[in-house]
Structures are given as C-alpha cells and as structure tokens.
Curated annotation (Swiss-Prot):
Keywords: ATP-binding, Autophagy, Cytoplasm, Kinase, Membrane, Nucleotide-binding, Protein transport, Serine/threonine-protein kinase, Transferase, Transport. Residues 338-352, 542-554 have a biased composition (Basic and acidic residues). It is a peripheral membrane protein. Coiled coil: none annotated. Residues 22-327 form the Protein kinase domain. Belongs to the protein kinase superfamily. Ser/Thr protein kinase family. APG1/unc-51/ULK1 subfamily. One of its GO terms (cellular component) is cytosol. It catalyses: L-seryl-[protein] + ATP = O-phospho-L-seryl-[protein] + ADP + H(+); L-threonyl-[protein] + ATP = O-phospho-L-threonyl-[protein] + ADP + H(+). It comes from Chaetomium globosum (strain ATCC 6205 / CBS 148.51 / DSM 1962 / NBRC 6347 / NRRL 1970) (Soil fungus). This is Serine/threonine-protein kinase ATG1. Homodimer. Forms a ternary complex with ATG13 and ATG17.
C-alpha cells in the first residue's frame, strides 16, 4: 500500500496496539470507509501496510467488494501485484495486512516528477532520466512502468480476471531492487514470496510498480460481458459511461489513459461530471492529441491512440497489445549502466537442461505466454482462478500454501455498535463482484484439496439471483469511486436531466459546468438533526458525479413510465431492507447516486435567509415554478425533521467508530465488558424498531418530493408546452433562480434518500441481530412470531424484518413534537434561549405536518396536465386515512396552538431586537454629543 500524507486528525495509535503478529505504527492514508496504517512484524520488524475497514460503515455492496477483494488477493502471487500477507477480522473491523510500498502511487510520482531528485529512492532515476519541461515522465521510465503494468494485466487476463479500476492512484511504487540491495539497513519490507520483489519485466535499476486495490475486480471470462458501472470517472471506458455491457477491454482503455498521463502529465480527458466526460470523449472522434512539449516517440503515441478507441471493437486486442513493440522490444535511450547484459553461456545451458528435464513444465509455461507469469499450474486444466495459486506460497512467512490464506477470527462476542456480520468468507468465495448477473459467474467445482473450505449449501450455489437481489439501492463512494447498478439508471436520469436543465440556453464557458457554492448551516434543533458527516464534508471539494442515461428522450416524453420505474426500484429496496414490499403509495421514488456535493442546505439553517423553514404567511407564489419549489421544499423540510429524529436513535445504535476513541485496535480486551454494558438487548430492539419506522417515513416524504419534481420536469421538457412559450417573456433572472432552486432541492433529496436508505439497512441488520439474541420466551424473538406474520418474510436479500406490534412513526413523531413544544414554552416563559425556542416550535410544526401527511398517493391515477393541479393535489393530501377524525382534529389543533405561540414569540423577539437596536443607537448618540461638547471624563494619569 502506498505511503500518503494523511489529513486525518486522529491521534497516533499507541505503540502496544497490535493486530495479529503485527504492531500498528502511524496512519499513512485514509478513505471514507478505511484507514491505512504502516506497521511492522513483531519478530522481524519488517514493514507492512495495514488497511483497516470498519464493518459498521459498509453497506451490502461494499462488503461484497471487500470480501471479493480478499478472495482474489488470497490467490494472487505476482511480482507486480500487491500481495496480501494476512487478514485479521475483529468484532468491528477487517484488517488487511498487505505489502508496503514506500514510494506512494504513480499519480504522486507524476505530480512530483520535478522533485524526484530530492528523494534518495528516486535520486538516481532523476539523474539518469530527467523529465522535459512541461512534459510527463522520461520515455525510459514510461516504457519501464508500462512493461510491468502489462505483466500484471496479462497475469489477470489469463486468470479471467478484470480489474475495472486501473488508474495511477492504484499503481503503487517501491524503490528499485538495486537500491534496496545497496541499502539493506534502510527499510526492510515484508515479502510475500521469494520473488515478490524481483521484477518480471522492466529494469532492475528503476522503481518497481505494483497493481493494487482489487475491490472492483471480478471473474470475467473472455466470452462474457458485464454491466455494473464502477471504477474512477476520469479513467472509465466510454462503453461503461454509456451504460453498455462491456468486457475485459475496458481495462485496456484505462491502461491507455494511464499511459497518456505518464507521457503528458495529465489525463487525456478532463471533465466535471460523467456526462461532460462522455461528451468530450465522443467529441474527440478518436483523435488523441499530444502537446508540442510532450517528448515521446511515435511508437508510444501510436499505442496510446490504439488503446483509446471509443468503440471496444476497434480497440487494440489483448494479443496485439501484449505483442506490441513497445511492450516486447528493448527500451531505447538507456544509459550504459542499465543496458541488459548478454546472458552467460553457462547459465543458458543450465536453463536448457532444466527445460529438458521438465518438459511438462516447459510446455505449460509456453502455453501460458511466457515469463511474465510466475504462477505455475498444478493441474492440466484447472479453474482459471485456482490457476493463480502458486507453489511459491510455500515461501510465505505464514506457511499456508496448502490451505490458502486463513482469516483468524476472535471468540464470539456480543456487538452493540456494528450490524450483524455478513456471510462468511467461505460463502463469498465465488462472489468477486457486485455486478448483477442472472447466472453464477463460475460453475467449475473447486479442487479436492479445498473442498472443506468451500463447502456450502447447494441452494446457495445453484440459486439464481432474483430481481430483488439486483435492487439498485446500495450506492457507495470512496474517493472517486462510484457503483451504479443497471436498475437505478432510470432513477439517475431524472435528477441528471433536471441538473442539466439550468445549463440550457446559457453561453458555455470553456466547456465546463460551473458549480454553485452553498453555505451549510449548523443545526441546533432539539430533534438531533446534525450536519453532514465529516467524511462527506471532506469530500466536498470533489467534482459532482452526474450521469446521463442513454434513454433520456424516453424519460422526457413519458413521465408515467418514469414514476413507475422509480416506484419499482423503491419497492425492490424495501423488500431487501424490510422483508416485504411497501406499496407504491408509501414509497414512490427511487434512488440515485450519492452526491459528494450537497447544494441543498441541511435543516435547519438559520443563517440562510431563504431556508426551508417558513411561517406560512409569506406572499402567494408568483408562478408555477414558485409553487413547485415551495411544495418540494415543504416535503423536504418535513422529511428532514423526521430524519433528524431518526438520527437520535441511530447514533445510540451505531456510535462513533472504536478507532476514534481507542485507536485502530478498537476497545482493549480488559474493557470489552464495560463497552458492552451500554445497551441491553431490549433497548437495542426498541431503538432499532423506532429508527427503522422513522427512516421509512422520511423515505416516503422524500419520494413525494421527487414525484412533484418528476411531474414538473415532464412539463418543462415538452417543447409544445405552453409554459415554454410563456417562459420566454418572463423575467429571465427570476425564472433562472427558481429553476436553480428546484435543481438544488432535487439533488439534495436524491443525496439524502441514499443516505437514509443506507442507514435503514444498517438498522435493519442491527434489529435482526438483536432479535435473534433475545431469550426465546421474549415476545420479539423470531420464534414467537404469529404464523400470519411469518408469511411477510419472503425476502431473497436476507433475513426478513418483523417490527413489534404497535410501533408507529406517527405516534413517535407526535410525542416528540409535544415534548419539544412544551420544553420551548417553558423556556419562553423563562426568557431563556428564545432563538432555540423558535427552532423547536418550527420543528414541532413540521413534524406534526408530517404526521398528518397522507401515505396514500395514488400515483397511477394521476393525470399529467399542463397546469399545477398535480402538485396541488399532492400537497393537499394532508390527512391520513389511517387516522381517525378525532386524532386528525387533535393534531391540527396542536399545530394551530404551536403556530400561535410561534407568532407571538417572533413578535416578542422582533420587539426585543428593535428595543436593543434603539438603545444602542441612543448610547452612540450620547457618546457623540459628549465628544462634541468636550464633556469627556479624563483618564487618570499615573504619577
């Protein structure tokens, strides 16, 4: 793993923190879901990299990626692939012990190319092969790294593996073998095998490249296609950006982008989002230009152009790429010391005798394309992935060649801070990807010696994935990563089209999309609403990752089809989360990719004049766009207060990561019992049920906001709409501001929807785990469910969820609103914290409005028209059929009472502010008068 400068504020772990046979040192990198530490072996002191992943912060798809990465790395042994030494799983974390790459990654190497001479490990390289001004790396270094990267790609190709995230950040560097040989006392790095640091290609005098991060890798035979969209945006192949099925040639495009960046110092295509990136790729017309300052040969330029073909059919094949002169030929321009020496006759004769003595081995190696492959097959035709396993494992420090890499687990301990652990690594041994496929990727039976480790129920192997398994609701991002299933493409299109609408009709500026900065206030609501997670805030500087679906015209012309697709996606997600489908009336909108930048301010934002919270006495909306914006914001505000209430429950269930308070090792063993005594199982079940129903309520309100936006967009996008005719005569500045406001709201709603859905899944897993740990006589134990209730548990995505009878989000919200309003009234009478009283009153009103909000939005019965009746009908359904008339009247009366108190409070605050301002002005006038008259009290002068 690379050594990066960390921006984390986390204190350095104690020196006695250990993971297995390794001692934790300092933190060298950090992501959204994992931290990377340097470490050393207890006995030898050899350096390693420790990637610590917190299980509680991973959704199902990220866990699949992690376990898939572990399963793949367990079998990969190649000099140019980062090796996995060990894997230690604790109660809350999974720790991957990996090879340590002290020179960092290739992106840092390219960025610091002018300062390489200052590093002892790269001083000789910079002296012998200097970089040209305003250009990339020296061509000798480019060809050297390309040969080593090709060696790793060839190794993966012959194992039917596709990496899917080849980029400079995942290409880690080590000092050259010659440098390590000459500086043995500098840093000893733990080796996974006897030839782990012996390059299979390139020059021994230059740094060694290793391919890392197999979180998106999967088994993909040469005749198969994948359709999961994942990887890093700037290095994605265009067929992935177009949501088309793709094969392993997608890696070739990524190799081409890396090669171009090494040659020029920058990526071939720069864009602020995926839509703009695809547009630039298509506009290039396969014409790849190099600047005049770029000093590379025509051979390298030709290879880049052959790799960067938009059409994968026209792209260079793997066979031609592996045999390209740049790959197979000698490196021109070498200094005399680096020119390969001719092989001695005695050594050549020895190798010849070895080949004659082992004809089978020689034939096997020739059939597998030569010396780049260091793993030797045992069987004539084994499973391609098993073919990766090498006898060289016997040289591993762990001596686990026969059984593969084992994962040590601690003794079973109750957990109160993390969701139930996913299925074991054994069950995940064939799940290398999060891609949705209808047939298992591999049907080849395991070798006999692994039968005990790979045994699983027959149903788990043969059961095909259902539609519910493909529900596109697990969206994750770590740095520049993005994962989007095919089912969610329609949901993405709605928000993407709305986000692009403000750009239409405006002059373009350099082909770039300008982002709008938004200040996010700090909530002080007593509901527990909190600002965005620091991990998300840290990512705010990144580009928005919007995607444009390949069927936008269909969406624009058929809003009914769009809403039905979104409803289906929500139902699929609810089936996977809760064990049964919620009706489309309850949840009517689907999920989009999470936005790193949230333009819609989180509730509440008292510092923003045009916030979500309003007193209901503002002037009537001017036009349709104003009414739509008001309706969307009303529902978004109600959902936000419900979300804030749910967060209070959630943060009791999932507290801060153990590594924040106790270092990477988590809670010390002697304090494990104290940490577990915080919540009883009854309390965990109660909190989980309450948080779950509140999250569902928040989802339903967010879905209604998206419903209104969908109807508004369907009219906006129709060219024959009368609105488009009248909009030409309106005030363009006011109209544009309203459209931008709606767009910001839609993007915020989509981001919040993803966050709520992910947290709901964590809560669901926590609830299932807690229910299973209850005594069998407990009413909430799974064995005590009524027979008619068990019929609801038809979930294919996991164990179904059965909340207790009587748990109601409306009841919880009503009690919370009453409690908040009473507390605010007491503080108001005592004249304490009047601004806080105002926030509490407003929050209580919004929460009661959410209680009155109807869950019966009969979406299929709606008729799309050119008027705003749809939004009015949605906003007018404020009475739930599940509530009695007396209950409705009681809630409405409570809303009126709180509004009355709120009006009086605001008048009082205004009076106090006016009096204070008048008093200040009077004091200032008195000071001015005294100064003019000279009546100023002289200061005493010390004698």
């Amino acid at each position: 793993m690379s050594e990066r400068t960390s921006s984390s504020r986390r204190s350095k772990p104690a020196s006695d923190d250990t993971i297995g046979n390794f001692v934790i040192d300092k933190e060298i990198g950090k992501g959204s879901f994992a931290q990377v530490y340097s470490g050393r072996h207890k006995v030898t002191g050899a350096l390693v990299a420790i990637k610590s992943v917190e299980l509680a912060r991973l959704n199902t798809k990220l866990k699949d990626n992690l376990y898939g990465e572990i399963e793949i790395l367990k079998r990969l042994r190649h000099p140019h692939i980062v090796a996995l030494h060990d894997c230690v799983e604790s109660r809350t974390h999974i720790n991957l012990i990996m090879e340590y790459c002290e020179l960092g990654d290739l992106s840092l190497f390219i960025k610091k190319r002018d300062k390489l001479i200052t590093n002892p490990g790269t001083h000789e390289l910079a002296r012998k092969y200097p970089v040209a001004p305003n250009s990339g790396l020296n061509e000798v270094v480019i060809r050297h790294f390309l040969k080593q990267l090709t060696s790793a790609i060839r190794f993966l190709r012959e194992a039917n593996l596709i990496h899917r995230d080849v980029k400079p950040q995942n290409l880690l560097l080590l000092p050259s073998p010659q440098y390590r040989e000459a500086n043995k006392m500098h840093k000893q790095i733990l080796s996974a095998s006897h030839d782990s640091f012996t390059p299979a290609a390139g020059l021994p005098s230059l740094p060694m490249l290793k391919l890392a991060d197999f979180g998106f890798a999967r088994v993909l035979p040469s005749t198969s296609l994948a359709e999961t969209l994942c990887g890093s945006p700037l290095y994605m192949a265009p067929e992935i950006l177009r949501y088309e099925k793709y094969d392993a040639k997608a890696d070739l495009w990524s190799v081409g982008t890396v090669l171009y960046e090494m040659a020029t110092g920058r990526p071939p295509f720069r864009a602020v989002n995926h839509v703009d990136l695809l547009r630039k790729i298509e506009a290039s017309g396969d014409v790849i230009r190099f600047s005049r300052e770029c000093v590379v040969s025509s051979e390298v330029k030709g290879l880049v152009r052959a790799l960067l073909k938009r059409n994968p059919v026209e792209r260079i094949s793997f066979e031609d790429f592996f045999h390209h002169p740049v790959i197979t030929g000698p490196i021109p321009g070498l200094v005399e010391d680096d020119i390969p020496k001719p092989e001695k006759p005695v050594l050549a004769e020895t190798k010849s005798r070895i080949r004659r003595a082992n004809p089978e081995l020689s034939h096997t190696r020739r059939s597998r394309a030569g010396p780049h492959l260091l793993a030797t097959p045992i069987e004539p035709k084994p499973n391609p992935l098993e073919q990766v396993a090498s006898p060289r494992l016997s040289y591993s420090p762990r001596q686990e060649a026969d059984e593969g890499l084992g994962i040590r687990r601690p003794l079973a301990q109750p957990s109160t801070s993390a969701p139930v652990r996913p299925i074991s690594y054994v069950d995940r041994s064939r799940r290398y990807s999060n891609a949705s496929t209808k047939v298992p990727a591999r049907d080849t039976p395991p070798p006999p010696h692994e039968g005990s480790n790979r045994s699983r129920p027959k149903s788990a192997v043969s059961r095909p994935l259902t539609d519910e398994d493909k529900a596109a609701q697990d969206v994750a991002f770590e740095r520049d990563y993005i994962i989007i299933d095919k089912t969610a493409v329609e949901v993405n299109a709605l928000a993407d089209q709305i986000s692009l609408y403000p750009q239409q009709g405006q002059p373009k500026s350099g082909g770039q999309i300008v982002r709008r900065a938004t200040q996010q206030g700090h909530p002080t609501s007593t509901t527990g609403a909190v600002p965005s997670h620091p991990g998300r805030n840290a990512q705010g500087g990144r580009n928005d990752h919007y995607r444009k679906a390949s069927h936008d015209k269909t969406l624009s012309g058929s809003p009914g089809a769009t809403t039905s697709v979104i409803s289906k996606a929500i139902q699929d997600a609810s089936l996977r989360l809760f064990g049964f489908k919620y009706s489309p009336q309850m949840l009517s909108k689907g999920q989009s990719p999470p936005q790193i930048y949230s333009p819609f301010p989180a509730y509440p934002t008292p510092s923003t004049p045009a916030g979500l919270i309003m007193d209901g006495k503002q002037s009537a909306p001017v036009d349709e766009d104003s009414r739509v914006a008001q309706c969307i914001e009303d529902y978004a505000t109600r959902s936000d207060v419900v979300y804030g209430f749910a967060e209070v429950k959630y943060k009791q269930l999932v507290p801060l990561a153990p590594s924040v308070e106790h270092g990477l090792g988590g809670v010390p063993t002697d304090r494990m019992g104290e940490e577990e005594e915080g919540l009883t199982m009854d309390a965990v079940v109660s909190l989980s049920e309450e948080a779950l129903v509140l999250y569902v309520k928040a989802l339903s309100l967010l879905a209604k906001s998206m419903d209104i936006a969908s109807l508004w967009w369907s009219r906006k996008s129709r060219p024959e709409s009368s609105n488009n005719v009248h909009s030409a005569t309106r005030d363009s500045v006011n109209t544009q501001a309203l459209v931008l406001k709606i767009n910001a709201a839609v993007q915020w709603i989509r981001s919040r929807f993803n966050e709520v859905l992910e947290k709901a899944e964590i809560v669901r897993l926590r609830l299932v785990e807690a229910q299973n740990q209850l005594p069998e006589e407990h009413p909430s134990h799974p064995s005590n469910r009524p027979p008619e209730t068990s019929a609801l548990g038809g979930s294919s995505g996991g164990q179904a969820t059965f909340p207790s009878v009587g748990i109601s989000a409306e009841k919880l919200m009503y009690d919370r609103a009453v409690e908040m309003s009473r507390t605010a009234a007491i503080n108001e009478i005592a004249s304490e914290d009047l601004p806080g009283c105002e926030i509490s009153y407003v929050t209580a009103v919004r929460m009661l409005e959410a209680v009155l909000d109807s869950d019966d939005d009969h979406l299929p019965k709606r008729r799309v028209s050119t008027s705003s009746k749809e939004e009015q009908s949605v906003a007018a359904q404020d009475a739930s059929d599940d509530m009695s008339s007396d209950d409705k009247q009681a809630v409405q009366k409570m809303v009126q009472m709180i509004n009355t108190r709120l009006t009086y409070l605001r008048k009082r605050m205004h009076t106090i502010a006016a009096a204070s301002k008048a008093q200040q002005q009077q004091q200032q006038q008195q000071v001015v008068v005294r100064r003019r008259s000279g009546d100023v009290t002289p200061r005493s002068v010390p004698t």
